[in-house]
Amino acid sequence: MKRWYVVHAYSGFEKSVAQALRDRISRIEIQDRFGDVLVPAEEVVEMRSGQKRRSEHKFFPGYVLIQIETYYEGGVPRIDNECWHLVKETPKVMGFIGGTADRPLPISSDEADAILRRVQDGAEKPRPKVLFEPGQMVRVIDGPFNDFDGLVEEVNYEKNRLRVAVLIFGRPTPVDLEFGQVQKS
């Protein structure tokens, strides 16, 4: 049975560590003892220079998840020495998280399912990088109401838009804006 283990990698090198693990696994031809290698992340959408940009936000910077064939020794989950050495000797890997240095423990099935669900949700619906709440003060930074301050009345994450009450001639006037047209005050 394959279980998920957490590997501590140098921060910023998670993707290269994941690729190195995949390469080493296929080179040694022990794919049957490994499953997925995953850098848990979600896609976020932000506005830069009036353009929507998609970027990736890692849930756990510095960590890589890997599925490894697990057997039980006295009721305790274990991985074989060859798998352990393959992971530990991968460049930019600092070790396993959980258990002891030479006897790592897998994360629970519930934790693994929650992480995988979160990754799936992030892939299906990219979320905005900046979150807004009704009642929050914002400053308009783009469009005809540039440099006006306003109060967020309504937020629509599906369309990446919000309704802001902007003071025009001393009266609050609702204006529909994109997330990229405002910044938090």
Swiss-Prot record:
Q: List the GO cellular component terms.
A: cytosol
Cited PROSITE patterns = NUSG
Q: Does the keyword ATP-binding apply?
A: no
Q: Enumerate the spans annotated as KOW domain.
A: 134-162
Q: From the record, give the cysteines joined by S-S bonds.
A: none
Asked if the Swiss-Prot or TrEMBL record annotates the protein with the keyword Transcription regulation, the reply is: yes
| Record keywords | Transcription, Transcription antitermination, Transcription regulation, Transcription termination
- Give one GO biological process term: transcription antitermination
Q: Which CDD domains match?
A: KOW_NusG, NGN_Bact_1
Q: Which SMART domains match?
A: KOW, NGN
Which family, according to UniProt?
Belongs to the NusG family.
- Give a short account of what the protein does: Participates in transcription elongation, termination and antitermination.
Q: Which HAMAP family match?
A: NusG
Q: What is this protein called?
A: Transcription termination/antitermination protein NusG
Organism of origin:
Xylella fastidiosa (strain 9a5c)
